[in-house]
């Protein structure tokens, strides 16, 4: 399978601070020392991925909208929320919304609930593109800001998306081609591209 960089595979993360009315753009990227200590998380990793010290590794804990490494995703999200919302008080950050654009199964949804609870959310609300009552053509950013009208106690929201979906498309095709080869279906795969 062709090689994809962590930057191509990583999810884009948007953190909405309802209290300050500010949105922060991040990347699902982390750099860890081989000892397990996280060095950096988010967009600040992008420039370092190609010049990593020998004792460190860079990767994305959220790929194709799914949590691929729970422990790293938890540490990354905690650091991002602390960076933008400040340190959680005794009761945590309050109510948080997780908005994921990919279709998830129940287990994948639970991973996001658990991530937000572990990161300091007191209560978690889940939403995706199947939200009812949204006028067609409404930007998702407006929908997420508007969730505060429905859930009055929301303190923050975390949106998991992909600004360049073509990266996901290329990766998914390469993965499909690899699986077809493994299953002995290369001829059938080639017919799909004709």
What is each stretch, according to the model?
Residues 1-25, 32-37, 45-144, 150-194:
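Nucleotide/phosphate-binding catalytic cleft detector across ATP-hydrolyzing
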């Amino acid at each position: 399978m062709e090689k994809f960089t962590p930057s191509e595979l990583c999810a884009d993360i948007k953190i909405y601070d309802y209290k300050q009315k500010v949105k922060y753009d991040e990347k699902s990227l982390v750099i860890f020392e081989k000892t397990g200590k996280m060095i950096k998380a988010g967009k600040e990793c992008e420039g370092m991925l190609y010049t990593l010290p020998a004792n460190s590794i860079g990767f994305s804990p959220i790929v194709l909208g799914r949590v691929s490494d729970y422990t790293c995703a938890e540490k990354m999200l905690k650091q991002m929320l602390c960076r933008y919302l400040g340190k959680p008080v005794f009761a945590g950050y309050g109510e948080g919304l997780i908005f994921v654009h990919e279709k998830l199964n129940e287990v994948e949804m639970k991973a996001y609930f658990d991530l937000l609870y572990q990161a300091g959310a007191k209560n978690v609300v889940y939403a995706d593109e199947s939200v009812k009552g949204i006028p067609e053509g409404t930007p998702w950013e407006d929908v997420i800001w508007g969730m505060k009208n429905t859930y009055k106690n929301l303190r923050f929201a975390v949106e998991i998306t992909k600004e360049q979906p073509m990266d996901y498309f290329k990766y998914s095709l390469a993965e499909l081609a690899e699986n077809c080869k493994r299953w002995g279906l290369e001829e059938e795969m080639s017919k799909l591209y004709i």
